[in-house]
């Protein structure tokens, strides 16, 4: 695991989170069963941040909500939100309600960290302790908390998934941050709907990709 408690996603010397999507190397990974199905969580960190700060989006499509707030296209909105959640709020967007709430939460988190000497994560109860972390700042601390929440929630989700697919031909073969890759047998396609319902239980929106290799062709 990394300092933030997030998995490193390295196995056998390969960083699966950083596999190139353009040069065709993903085609080398093929399923033992009939196909790969990847379930991706949409807007994972904005969803978690909204939960932490008590903000409700006006639509299920969070990136579309941000595009409307910023008055930019969908792709640009995703980029802007990612940069601000990890690097701090841009001056021109600091008056948006979502980022006002985020900033208030970050400030309070930082005050607690300095007063108590630690913060405790809500699901895992893991503590980020001040005397064990170098060069910490408010935004970095918030990022650590987000990544721990993501990892803790994913562990819970995977426990449910494993219970559902145990003794099946289909397997969960890879987990990378916000995506779960399944090696799916043709006669077990019904499992995907069951697995989607697990994410729904946690109010997470997902999208699916499938193919006969990891490039989804």
Q: Predicted regions span which residues?
A:
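Acidic, glycine-rich two-metal-ion catalytic cores of nucleic acid-processing enzymes
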Residues: 1-72, 125-162, 171-181, 185, ...
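Internal amphipathic alpha-helical segments of the cytochrome P450 catalytic fold
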Residues: 45, 90-91, 188-189
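In a subset of proteins, long, contiguous C-terminal domains/tails are tracked
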Residues: 181-217
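Conserved catalytic core of nucleic-acid polymerases
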Residues: 68-175, 202-206, 210-212, 216-217
């Amino acid at each position: 695991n990394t300092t933030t408690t997030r998995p490193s996603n390295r196995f056998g010397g390969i960083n699966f989170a950083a596999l190139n999507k353009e040069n065709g190397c993903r085609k080398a990974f093929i399923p033992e069963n009939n196909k790969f199905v990847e379930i991706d969580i949409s807007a994972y960190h904005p969803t978690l941040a909204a939960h932490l700060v008590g903000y409700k989006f006006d639509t299920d499509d969070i990136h579309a909500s941000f595009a409307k707030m910023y008055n930019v296209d969908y792709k640009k909105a995703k980029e802007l939100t990612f940069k601000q959640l990890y690097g701090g709020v841009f001056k021109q967007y600091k008056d948006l309600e979502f980022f006002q709430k985020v900033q208030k939460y970050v400030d309070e988190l930082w005050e607690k960290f300095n007063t108590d000497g630690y913060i405790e994560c809500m699901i895992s109860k893991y503590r980020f302790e001040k005397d064990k972390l170098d060069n910490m700042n408010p935004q970095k601390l918030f990022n650590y908390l987000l990544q721990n929440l993501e990892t803790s929630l994913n562990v819970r989700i995977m426990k449910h998934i494993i219970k559902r697919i145990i003794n099946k031909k289909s397997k969960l073969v890879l987990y990378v941050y916000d995506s779960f890759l399944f090696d799916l047998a043709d006669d077990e396609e019904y499992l995907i709907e069951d697995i989607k319902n697990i994410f729904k239980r946690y109010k997470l929106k997902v999208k699916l990709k499938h193919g006969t290799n990891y490039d989804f062709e």
